[in-house]
């Protein structure tokens, strides 16, 4: 099984690029970040034609994450959850419980905290990471399988 992650920076304008990439590599699961569209505007049919089911947490014009899974791998008890780590509604984290491998997958699009000289922006980023850590630690403590992928905006 291959899992891939891609900050696609506006999914609707990169469909042909995605198709070429996908047909060459054939990952089972794709984590997309910065899809830059509302969930209702996501090109679900395009991905279905490639055999991929789309799980979307979109936001108009910015942010947004999606998880694409080969339809043949899905189970009725798979579960998707939108996760919000701040008081503001920001589509940055989506959680997928994948029954077939008894694993939770998080797709993350972390906030940018640059420049560091903007202490408030950087401070908000660190607080966001603390909340992400609090979300993930129970999996580790309870020895549950978890995959965390995405764009972490490290710089």
Label the predicted regions:
Residues 1-49, 62-65:
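N-terminal, active-site-proximal structural segment of metallo-dependent hydrolase catalytic domains
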Residues 1-10, 102-115, 149:
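Active-site-proximal beta-strand elements of phosphoester/diester hydrolases
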Residues 6-7, 22-40, 105, 135-155:
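Active-site beta-strand/loop signature of hydrolases that rely on acidic residues for catalysis
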Residues 14-15, 89, 132:
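Amphipathic coiled-coil/heptad-repeat helices and related helical stalk/stem segments
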Residues 35-38, 42-117:
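Structured beta-strand-rich core segments of catalytic domains in phosphoester-bond hydrolases
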Residues 116-124:
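Short histidine-centered catalytic/ligand-binding loop motif
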Residues 124-136:
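Long, well-ordered alpha-helical scaffolding segments within enzyme catalytic domains
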């Amino acid at each position: 099984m291959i899992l891939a992650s891609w900050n696609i920076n506006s999914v609707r304008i990169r469909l042909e690029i995605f198709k070429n990439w996908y047909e060459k590599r054939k990952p089972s699961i794709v984590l997309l970040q910065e899809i830059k569209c509302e969930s209702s505007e996501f090109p679900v049919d395009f991905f279905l034609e490639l055999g991929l089911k789309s799980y979307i947490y979109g936001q108009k014009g910015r942010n947004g994450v999606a998880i694409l899974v080969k339809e043949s791998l899905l189970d009725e008890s798979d579960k998707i959850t939108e996760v919000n780590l701040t008081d503001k509604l920001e589509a940055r984290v989506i959680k997928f419980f994948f029954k077939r491998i008894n694993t939770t997958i998080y797709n993350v699009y972390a906030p940018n905290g640059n420049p560091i000289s903007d202490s408030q922006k950087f401070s908000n980023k660190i607080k966001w990471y603390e909340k992400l850590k609090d979300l993930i630690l129970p999996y580790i403590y309870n020895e549950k399988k978890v995959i965390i992928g995405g764009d972490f905006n490290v710089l």
